[in-house]
Regions:
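Extended Gly/Ser/Thr-rich low-complexity repeat segments
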Residues: 143-147
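Alpha-helix N-cap/helix-initiation sites
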Residues: 2, 19-22, 40, 44, ...
Length: 147
């Protein structure tokens, strides 16, 4: 995953739990990286290690860590880094979800080594929409659920 994901984990932890918790998470995960470069790809194992260590250090489930990261991704990372792209996705949530594949195509221009998940929509109705998620990466469903 790109460093922007690991940086989002760091920012989430630091802002909500403090720098000491972040240092404890880095130590527990055996990650020897002082800072993450947003545009650099990192081994997925680093991201998973950080999430697992956050679960242990914070005393919450891995699912709760990933839920919090999903919320953070939209409310903080998305707004700060991709506001223009997100606004171009549509005038409402339904339009954005329908246009999500186009959003990832645009993101891939910024992150050429990105392996994005695949989203498809079906059963589009006035008050509901079914979103189907597929990824080569295992275990990120809770992250996606809270986006």
């Amino acid at each position: 995953m790109y460093g922007i994901v690991n940086k989002a984990i760091q920012d989430l932890i630091t802002e909500n739990f403090g720098a000491d918790k972040w240092e404890a998470i880095k130590e527990k995960s055996d990650i020897d990286v002082d800072f993450f470069l947003s545009n650099e790809p990192y081994d997925d194992a680093i991201t998973y290690s950080l999430a697992i260590a956050a679960s242990d250090v914070l005393g919450i489930t891995l699912g709760q860590v990933l839920n919090a990261l999903g919320e953070w991704w939209i409310l903080k990372t998305g707004k700060e880094k991709y506001a223009g792209l997100m606004e171009a996705g549509g005038n409402n949530l339904k339009e954005f979800l329908v246009n999500l594949p186009l959003f990832h195509n645009r993101i891939m221009l910024m992150y050429p080594k990105l392996t994005p998940p695949e989203f498809k929509v079906s059963h589009i109705e006035e008050s509901s929409i079914h979103v189907h998620y597929h990824s080569k990466r295992e275990g990120l469903q809770e992250f996606v659920r809270c986006l």
